[in-house]
Amino acid sequence: MSRKIINSPTDFKNIIGEFLGSTDWKLITQKEINSFAEATEDYQWIHVNTEKVITDSPFKKTIAHGYYSLSLIPKLSSEIWECKNLKLILNYGTEKIRFISPVICNSFIRASIMVLDAKDYKGGILLTSKVTIEIKNNEKPALIAETLSLLYQ
């Protein structure tokens, strides 16, 4: 996968509606799930108890936190596109987040991004993107969200 190169933040205005691409598949491990649980102090058994899930979970394996998948968006986005002449990018928010399918431990995920909007805002460009986190060999995605990023040149 090669990254889409954007020359400047204002150039996003010219590619509204364009599909920017998808990442390579990324394995989601129990180690990563446990690290996220530790960082957020969310130790719900469905995420961390590898024995209890065998008997008490419909998935029979642990699942990643929905917010873990969401938190991967900035890293995965950087694999899809790079903006030259960019001094700073700020996370401005996320809208319309839907956690559709659980990410079962040892599944592979990838992100796909489409530019929904780009407009002048607060001296920068407010970029709205549709991000889909897919699960390999799963009909439905893990999540779909509209991310807002403020880009400064």
List where the protein language model places each region.
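Hot-dog-fold acyl-thioester-processing enzymes
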Residues: 2-90
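HotDog/MaoC-like acyl-thioester-processing domains
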Residues: 1-15, 103-153
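Short alpha-helix capping/helix-loop boundary micro-motifs
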Residues: 94-99
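Compositionally biased, intrinsically disordered low-complexity segments
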Residues: 49, 92, 128-130
